[in-house]
Amino acid sequence: MEIFKVIFLGIIQGLTEFLPISSSGHLVLFQELLGINTDQITLDVFLHFGTVIPVLIIFWDDVRDIIFFKKEKRWLTILILVGIIPTGIIGILFEDFFANLFSSVKTVGFMLLVTGFLLYLSEKLSNYNKELKEMQYHNALIVGVAQGMAIIPGISRSGSTIVASLLQGFDRDAAARYSFLLSAPVIFGAGLVELKDALSTGLEQLTWLSIIIGTIFAALSGYFAIKYLLYILRKGKLTVFAYYCWIVGIMIIILAGIF
């Protein structure tokens, strides 16, 4: 794989992993419509690991306290664990089903329309007043289920989790903070699963230079994506991403029908 394609995929992975526009949907889109092969197991592994890095940097205070299970953040650690449970169950039981059922480009387009609708709905109907400390176990479970549904290409992981929090009345900062903290172990876990597959097939597919470059660009683009999304959330302009999802979704459906 040429270096510029590795850089491109790294940037796409970092941006779409955290912006509420569906990373899986865009990867399917670029693979099918632009002829870019994303079926590089080794690269996928390190792109996933690369996107964990900005979460660790931006939310380091929370991450450090969670890792060391500090008493003052024990409540947050438990909420993260509770949220991971339904995500893991859905991923283990239904990943192959959804991957086979919803892997067509046209269906990705329809799912992006759904993502846009949910983003728009959350911005218009939500009553943001709860802080993250007010989150209960059932709230975390609902967010975890929403994250699990993001295995459907075209459904955004960050979008679904943020929407799930907003529709339960949590403020924007709480929704974003919990979404990104919940994403880190899930993304890291997905990377470990892919690493197992890569080890079984061999790691000779790419040079270490390509792997390092792809990881760096995934981390850098992921960092700026998180910062930008936090800015958009605080400005109350989440509908920007809804319009984007609608436009891209309609374009995908039209192009899929033509070709």
Curated annotation (Swiss-Prot):
Molecular function in Gene Ontology: undecaprenyl-diphosphatase activity
Top-level EC class as recorded in UniProt: hydrolase
GO biological process annotation, one example: response to antibiotic
Transmembrane annotation, as ranges: 1-21, 40-60, 75-95, 101-121, 179-199, 206-226, 239-259
Keywords: Antibiotic resistance, Cell inner membrane, Cell membrane, Cell shape, Cell wall biogenesis/degradation, Hydrolase, Membrane, Peptidoglycan synthesis, Transmembrane, Transmembrane helix
Primary residence: membrane
Cellular compartments per GO CC: plasma membrane
Protein origin, superkingdom: Bacteria
EC number(s) on file: 3.6.1.27
Reaction(s) catalysed (UniProt annotation): di-trans,octa-cis-undecaprenyl diphosphate + H2O = di-trans,octa-cis-undecaprenyl phosphate + phosphate + H(+)
Localization (cell): Cell inner membrane
Membrane association type: Multi-pass membrane protein
Misc: Bacitracin is thought to be involved in the inhibition of peptidoglycan synthesis by sequestering undecaprenyl diphosphate, thereby reducing the pool of lipid carrier available.
NCBIfam families: undec_PP_bacA (TIGR00753)
Matching HAMAP family: Undec_diphosphatase
PANTHER family: UNDECAPRENYL-DIPHOSPHATASE (PTHR30622:SF2)
Family statement drawn from the similarity comment of this UniProt entry: Belongs to the UppP family.
Function: Catalyzes the dephosphorylation of undecaprenyl diphosphate (UPP). Confers resistance to bacitracin.
Protein name: Undecaprenyl-diphosphatase
Gene: uppP
